[in-house]
Every structure is written in C-alpha cells, then in structure tokens.
Amino acid sequence: MTQLTLFQTARDHVSLVRMVKGKMRYYLLAIDYSLFGDCILEKIYGGMGNSKPTRVLREYYSSWIEAKERLEIVSQAKKKKGYKPLVTTI
C-alpha cells in the first residue's frame, strides 16, 4: 500500500444517473481515506431536484482493494437496474 502524506489524497469515484417516472435520480460512489488510514466507500443517492441527498451511506474497509472491489460490485448492480454513467463534456 502506498503511504500518503498529509496533503495527498487518493480518490476513486463513479457517478450514475437514471430516469424514474419522469424524474432524474443519481447515485454517487466514492472511495476515500479516513484519518486513521481506513478506506471509506461512500454511497450518496437521491433525486436531481432535491436540495439534499436522500441518503448518505458509508462502509469502512481495511484496504483500498477491498473498497474498490465493493465499488465495482455496487456499480454493476446499479447498472443492471438501469443506471448509466454520467457523461460530461467540457
């Protein structure tokens, strides 16, 4: 595992969207490190028109690899339910 200094961050994320009954829904998955070196998989989801997310869930893992594997599993499950990657152009 790579040791991070105070100002370095490692991050991995996936942004998914889908249309449900005429409304856009989003599902964000992000991996980040905690202050104690654990990896956190954060799942944030809700409706696009809402000012706050419907729910924010955090799962803690001892390694980046475990968190990344879980991110891939959740991402694939959401894609099976109709979520598609959010594509942005600059």
Predicted regions and their residues:
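Negatively charged, low-complexity tracts enriched in Asp/Glu with abundant Ser/Thr
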Residues: 1-22
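Compact soluble domain cores
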Residues: 1-3, 69, 86
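Feature targets compositionally biased, intrinsically disordered low-complexity regions
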Residues: 21, 45-46, 81
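Charged, amphipathic alpha-helical segments
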Residues: 22-28
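Short aromatic-glycine-(Arg/Gly/Cys) micro-motifs in beta-strand/loop hairpins
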Residues: 30-57, 72, 88
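A short, charged, amphipathic alpha-helix used as a generic interaction element across diverse proteins
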Residues: 51-53, 62-79
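Short, mixed-charge low-complexity intrinsically disordered segments
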Residues: 77-90
